[in-house]
Swiss-Prot record:
Listed GO biological process terms: regulation of gene expression
Gene: RSP40
Keyword vocabulary terms for this entry: Early protein
InterPro entries: IE68 (IPR003403)
UniProt feature, compositional bias: Acidic residues: 181-191, 207-286, 294-343
Name of the protein in its database record: Transcriptional regulator ICP22 homolog
Compositional bias of kind Low complexity: 355-364
Organism: Suid herpesvirus 1 (strain Kaplan)
Lineage, highest ranks first: Viruses, Duplodnaviria, Heunggongvirae, Peploviricota, Herviviricetes
UniProt family annotation: Belongs to the herpesviridae ICP22 family.
Spans annotated as Disordered: 1-73, 173-364
Bias (Pro residues): 12-46
Amino acid sequence: MDRVWADWYEPVPSPPFSPVDPPGPRPTTPVPGSSPPSPASTPTPPKRGRYVVEHPEYGPPPDPEEVRVHGARGPGAFCAAPWRPDTRRLGADVNRLFRGIAVSAADVTGDTRALRRALFDFYAMGYTRQRPSAPCWQALLQLSPEQSAPLRSALRELNERDVYDPRVLSPPVIEGPLFGEECDVDEDDAGSDTTVASEFSFRGSVCEDDGEDEDEEEDGEEEDEDEEGEEEEDEEEEEGDEDGETDVYEEDDEAEDEEDEEDGDDFDGASVGDDDVFEPPEDGSDGEGSGSDDGGDGEDEDEDEDEDEDEDDGEDEEDEEGEDGGEDGEDGEEDEDEDGEGEEGGKDAARRGTRAPTRPAAAP
């Protein structure tokens, strides 16, 4: 029976000797017709872990069909035997994870810190020979037993190799942009980081100034200002249209008020300018209660007009009756008109609460 060899960290006891071959040296007496006895030889141990059926780290040997199927697609298609260290591929994979965090994470700094910590933990476990079991691998990587078939196959292949020569790896050359580069920021009073996704530059590091982004922001601000200016102009035009319509209505109202004042219907006591001319009504009345605002000026003009009319009438009478009779009649009529107009002016002044105007002396 062959001796079963286990890994260097898992010793397996040797099987008991067969009762047919008791311990101790064999007899030295040769048997006739047989070859001389040869010394007992120890079998050469196989490679580590080859004959271990249920390995505590990667379990039983996986089914080759499961390794082929899940190693080609799905969550388990991330490792394939044989494994070789590739720092360039490792750097590209980590940068890809940083990109996903930068474009979608709410707490970018916290998530990138968790990724870096996970990478370090796996290295530290391997460095200190803390080897997770098969269920532990499945729980850490969130894989089902079938999906972990390629992983168990790669781990078994690594365990069957000889001891590796230690060496120090050089830094890889990673194609940019580097999404994991962050600027250090101060923490707030609560102790939480204030780093947000906008602090990452998708054209490079955020610590570098990007003139193109600033130009785009300035262009956007200018466009917003132009749009706001156009909106304000439109609002001013609309307000101007409304004001214009209102002015038209106000002008119409003012025109109606002026017409009413001229007719003498609405007297508001406002002053009338010297340029306003009083037009006597067509019925021949003396215009008492007219819409003139200032009684003194309007009455003086009315008296002057009456005097002109009386003088014209007097001239006609002079032509008909003679100079003597005409002059007497004219003087009498003028005196009567003056007395009547004085009384009417006094009544208007008393009604308006003003003093009756003083009429200048009539010319001889």
